[in-house]
Amino acid sequence: MMPILVTLNKISVTFGSRRVLNDISLSLRPGKILTLLGPNGAGKSTLVRVVLGLIPPSSGSLVREPGLRIGYVPQKLHLDATLPLTVSRFMRLKPGVKKADILPALTRVQAAHLLDQPMQKLSGGENQRVLLARALLNRPQLLVLDEPTQGVDVNGQLALYDLIEQLRKELGCAVLMVSHDLHLVMAKTDEVLCLNQHICCSGAPEVVSTHPEFIAMFGNRGAEQLAVYRHNHNHRHDLHGKIILKNSGSRGA
């Protein structure tokens, strides 16, 4: 039986008199991608913080595998525009990082050419790849991605999702991903959890897409996007949006 890296059992989180999460149960397993969907204010980021151990649940239990290595890509990175910070220096700010590990991590996400570039000059897609490379430095068993394609154009989104799937296969890690991108993300997702303070519905994308609570939340168009897009591609996209056929070289989009 596949081991479980993280188990949440009937988790609730309350801030003052306001209940943000109510009765949440889920499991994260190696090699599986779980995507959290939900409207703004649904509690997605709070749930991520619980999984990361940044905030304790008000009730319920959280069990993590001892010594679990987690890589985290935050929703936003705010940097002082006047701060001289290259990608290399930014990577070294992570505790315990060896200089020799930085270039291989960037190479893994097709961003080695950014090593000496200022962080503030990166595009949205380049920035997310650097954050992902930084998250890989501790060889994570669990990757937590909070809106990884925010501020990234469509080609960049496709490239990032292809990369996430590739890393999942190479590392065998679990992936917990928060996303609003119904049409794009579902092709790579094993399980969808639809959240609005509580779990409205969960399961495989094709199952969730027909659930009445999902349709009430995202509408019929959301249901169509979730159900229709789940198919195999014969290509992937590189950092610059170029199409790379799986059994050949590359060509322009």
Swiss-Prot record:
ATP binds at G38, P39, N40, G41, A42, G43, K44, S45. GO terms for molecular function: ABC-type zinc transporter activity; ATP binding; ATP hydrolysis activity; ATPase-coupled transmembrane transporter activity. Gene3D superfamilies: P-loop containing nucleotide triphosphate hydrolases. It is found in: Cell inner membrane. Residues 6-227 form the ABC transporter domain. It comes from the Bacteria. Coiled coil: none annotated. It catalyses: Zn(2+)(out) + ATP(in) + H2O(in) = Zn(2+)(in) + ADP(in) + phosphate(in) + H(+)(in). Pfam families: ABC_tran. It is a peripheral membrane protein. CDD domains: ABC_Metallic_Cations (cd03235). Its EC number is 7.2.2.20. Keywords: ATP-binding, Cell inner membrane, Cell membrane, Ion transport, Membrane, Nucleotide-binding, Translocase, Transport, Zinc, Zinc transport. One of its GO terms (cellular component) is ATP-binding cassette (ABC) transporter complex. GO terms for biological process: response to zinc ion. The complex is composed of two ATP-binding proteins (ZnuC), two transmembrane proteins (ZnuB) and a solute-binding protein (ZnuA). Belongs to the ABC transporter superfamily. Zinc importer (TC 3.A.1.15.5) family. NCBIfam families: PRK09544.1 (NF007090). Part of the ABC transporter complex ZnuABC involved in zinc import. Responsible for energy coupling to the transport system. This is Zinc import ATP-binding protein ZnuC. The gene is znuC.
